[in-house]
Design a protein with these regions (language model features):
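Mature catalytic core of soluble alpha/beta enzymes
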Residues: 4-216
Length: 216
């Protein structure tokens, strides 16, 4: 009886001492918002390496997606006056994805809304409601059909169109970062209002990630 009890206690001890995934959270500011990446690995260093790798990937994407940075592809493209511009692979992929979303939604999503964004002063200290005549004038330059994807990372904007990828930027960055994962890591990424959950949730027996939506 004592041997059985001892074996049982040993089994309980071994179960309790089983290695649990270790987590590491990287908090940082990018793309004009706060972001957080929590990664889990076999030890804290592995988790930290994963989180830092994803953070670096996201930071590297900012020049590809920003339209306000003068050193960015979008800034050059928006100020090219209809000339063909060569952009990075990341920028081209983001524009290509934006065009696909525009086509899928029949234009309900449109990445050429930059003239209207500027007109309304969104994300500035001069936000206001413009006159209808101003809106109509800006709309004359809006339309995803004004984007020409010419291949080999070559892009041209027609009819005075300008790109604003803010509508998909953080989601695109989430997917691009997730593409680096090899399937062994578990990651919860919060990029502004965009959330990506990958692998198994080590904090739940089911391994599932639970998402709640307030006031859907």
């Amino acid at each position: 009886m004592k041997r059985i009890l001892a074996a049982f206690m040993l089994l309980v001890c071994m179960t309790g001492c089983a290695a649990q995934p270790q987590g590491y959270t990287a908090d940082f500011f990018a793309m004009d918002t706060f972001m957080s990446i929590t990664a889990y690995g076999e030890n804290e260093q592995a988790a930290q390496d994963t989180a830092v790798q994803l953070e670096q990937r996201i930071n590297a994407l900012e020049p590809a997606l920003s339209r306000t940075r003068e050193d960015s592809d979008l800034y050059r493209l928006n100020h090219a006056d209809g000339a063909v511009c060569e952009v990075s692979e990341d920028t081209y992929a983001a524009i290509e994805a934006a065009v696909q979303y525009a086509e899928w939604t029949g234009g309900a999503f449109d990445p050429t809304m930059a003239p209207l964004t500027d007109l309304w002063g969104i994300n500035t200290d001069n936000a206001h409601i413009p006159a209808q005549a101003e809106i109509d004038a800006a709309l004359a330059h809006v339309g995803y059909q004004n984007i020409e994807l010419l291949g080999d990372n070559q892009v041209r904007l027609l009819n005075g169109a300008q790109l604003d990828l803010g509508g998909i930027g953080k989601g695109f960055a989430t997917d691009a970062a997730a593409a680096l994962l090899d399937g062994s890591a578990s990651v919860l990424a919060t990029l502004g209002g965009n959330i990506g959950a990958y692998g198994e949730n080590p904090n739940r027996d089911s391994g599932n990630w639970v998402v709640g939506i307030a006031d859907p």
